[in-house]
Amino acid sequence: MTTSVDRTDGVLIDGSAGAIQPGSARFDHGQRRAASPGLWLPVYTLAHRELVRFFRQRTRIVGALGQPIIFWVLFGAGLSGSFRGPADMSYQEYFFPGVAVMILMFTAIYSTISIIEDRREGFLQGVLVAPIPRASLVLGKVFGGTILAVLQSLAFLTVGPALSLVGLAPELHSGLTWVNAPAVIGFLALVGFSLTALGYLIAWPMDSTHGFHAIMSVFLLPMWLLSGSFFPPGESVWLSWVIRLNPLTYGVAGLRRIMATNPAAVEALPAWWLCLTVTVLAAACYVGAAVWMTGRRSAHNAR
């Protein structure tokens, strides 16, 4: 019995029996549909795999929360005397939603590094030759990263008031209540979904984590800084336009509107409907581009 390998599709063909596996040119489309587990089972499996991988790395959990908390406490204390936001808002209060979005971004983006690792270990190639829609791979990775990002961002939002009670953030009024908690969680999930899809787009063509970190430094970190998270738009006209054209600006502004304790503090922000619309459109564009990129036949996908 001889066995040959179809290099184009990366599947085995049993030459003696004539059994052709999914992926060959003669494989019937009806058989492919019958062999496919559908869209959502692979999505659930891949998302669950991302969660298991994360919670097995306990140092990653500490680092994901520890660094943003240190940022917030130190910058909040250092700049509190020289900054007053809208409606006399303290810097600790102004920076609070910005740090929550920073946690969303870095957790979502870093979770997509697993794409590079999976390709190196051969797992990704196995998924690509499986009879599942390419959208399942994208959505599985994106949903897994989104869940992790939202959980960590929520953990920070609940830890913040506790830090204010012990004197580390005396000027904080978090704005998170039982009334607006569902809206906060829903909007965090939407922003996290968008950012994870963006991370997928960046990670997919990468061959090494070093290149991914370089993109993080020159593109994603400025994207967060120029979203109104760290400082509000100033007198500079060009800087104000850059901030307005940044899709993440509307994610930060939407979260500020939901958590606002003083309506006067958010009067200058984009309208709520605009924040929601831009965030949804950005997420749809990122996911659509990710599905298209994953579905392309290329030598890179086969590696």
Please name every model-derived segment.
Residues G76-G81, G126, A130, P161, ...:
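Transmembrane helix-loop junction
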